[in-house]
Amino acid sequence: MSKIPVIVIVGPTAVGKTSLSIELAKKLDGEIISGDSMQVYRGLDIGTAKITPEEMDEIKHYLIDVTDPSEPFTAAKFQTETRKWIETIHQAGKLPIIVGGTGLYIQSVFYDYDFGNVSEDKAYRAELEQLNKTLLWQMLEQQDPESAAQIHENNKRRVIRALEVMHLTGKPFSEYQVHNVLNDTYKPLFLGLDLDRALLYERINQRVNLMFEEGLVTEAKKLYDQHLVDVPAVCGIGYKELFPYFEGKSSLEEAKELIQKNSRHFAKRQLTWFRNRMEIDWIQAGVSTTEAEALNKAETFLSVK
């Protein structure tokens, strides 16, 4: 049986992945699967820079708004769902296109990740629960920098799980999870968008400013009022930074600057992770030739049977 071709567009936040994916889908008769761990949640629209129906431009999208913020959507769940939708899109005679910045989720689709059979150490986990999230993430960064590059400091639950797995097995969480052999079912082309660091950071700052103009504070306040302050859905950047403001512990400007700072750091970690963990064909973003170069690489890839 021939392998299913899949175009995968990755890169840091605010680099232009969404607009490129729409253009490629139009020209290559594709449908798009979101590879973003946050855009699966309903109601998390502004803070996740979720694509709007207008921006979709009649291109069918999958794995957007599929669960409530109170329900965790794990990498294992993403793996299962994405593989299902790849098959569905392919059977319909369309080209599956995955776009997103959550490297662990995307990689899990194409490599045979093991999500799971390490048991728990409840006593050790209870000890870790007593530590603050910054210290926990620093512990992870020292012991397993690859996992730390992918897991955000705010995601305390996942940081603790990574430390727990290392405690129980003696090997890094990142090594435990992935077998570096591509799954035989798919033939992926990984296209990465890169941008001058200063320009990328300016884009990020501008995006955060726009989020505030579009109502990010109201969106975050709804989560806060629903007591959804510790669920994985709000561990992403853009929500928890506002909670101290709601509690009168920081100013709105301080919250905005913290979101911008955390977003810049996250973009840097994304780039590091993609460069170290996946074989990616990199394209310069933000120039007049970006779309043409991506289309040329995709058409060449698809022409090889």
Curated annotation (Swiss-Prot):
UniProt-listed GO biological process terms: tRNA modification
Organism, as annotated: Listeria monocytogenes serovar 1/2a (strain ATCC BAA-679 / EGD-e)
Keyword Nucleus attributed: no
One Pfam family linked to the record: IPPT
Lineage, highest ranks first: Bacteria, Bacillati, Bacillota, Bacilli, Bacillales
Protein family (similarity comment): Belongs to the IPP transferase family.
Cofactor: Mg(2+)
Gene, per the UniProt record: miaA
Protein name: tRNA dimethylallyltransferase
Site positions per UniProt: Interaction with substrate tRNA: T102
